[in-house]
Amino acid sequence: MKFARPHENRKVNGNGNGNGHRRTKRQPGISEVAHEAPKDGGKLIVLTAPLTEAIDHAGYFIQMAMASLPIWMEGVINKKYPKWRDLEKNEDSSARYMPAGVRLVETSLLREYQKDDIVACFPEDLHKFVGPRTRVVAVSTHNPLGVTFAAGVYTSIFGSSRMPINSHYSRELFASIKGSPYRNNFKVIVGGSGGWQITQTDSFEELGVDCVVEGRSESTDTLDLFRKAIRQEELPRQIDVKHPLDREGILFPDSRTPSA
C-alpha cells in the first residue's frame, strides 16, 4: 500500500479561520451522506475509534483535557490547538495512523482474515467502507459516556454540562453507525478501556452495541467472537476473553501505521 505524503490527503475539520471560537460543523454520519454503496460491497471488518481518540497517534497531551472538559469548552481547545483535527489518510481513505489498540486488533485478525477484508478508518469515512458485505464494525473507546471520576470533577467545576468532549464524539460515532443503511447486516463490537461504561449503564440499545469485549484482542475467544459475528450469529452482551496462555500468543502491533 502506498502512503500519502503528510501534506496530501489531510482533512482539516477546522472552521476556516482557525480562531477556534466556535465549534466546527459536524461531519455527516453514514445515514446522512448521499449514500452509494462501496463498489466492492464494503469491507468485511471495519475498525474505528472516536475522532478524539483517533488523534492519540500524535501524542497529544490534550487527550486528558478532552476526556474531562465539558463539550461547551471545546472552543478553548480549538483556539489553542486549531489543527488537532488534522487527519492523515492513505490513498484509499483508510487511516494512516490509529491508536495502538486498534492496530493490535488488526494484527490479531490478520492471523485469520485477508488484508483486503479489514480496514481501519476514521469516523467520517465509515460510509466508504461499510456496505452490504460488512459483518463487523469494531469500535475502540476509552470514555464513551463520560462517567469517570475525572470527568465528574472537571465538569462540576466548569459547568452543569457533564458530557466531556470525547464522550460527545463517541456518541456521535455510535449514532452514525446505528444509522447505517446496512445496520441489520453487521454486529457492533466494542473494546478498549471504556467498555465497562456501556456494560454498567446498560447502554447497549441506546448506542446500538451488540457486544462489549473485556480482555486482549489476540485471545482465541476474541477470534471466535468475530467468527460468530461474521456468521451473523447472536453475540453475548458482554464477554471476558481469556488471556493468551503463552508468550507466543501475545501480539504487538508493528507500528501505528498499517503494514506496507
Annotate each predicted stretch with a short phrase.
Residues 83-112:
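Short, charged N-terminal beta->alpha structural module
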Residues 61-92, 144-172:
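A solvent-exposed, charged loop/short amphipathic helix patch at secondary-structure junctions
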Residues 101-104, 117-249:
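Glycine-rich beta-alpha loop elements in corrinoid/cobalamin-binding modules
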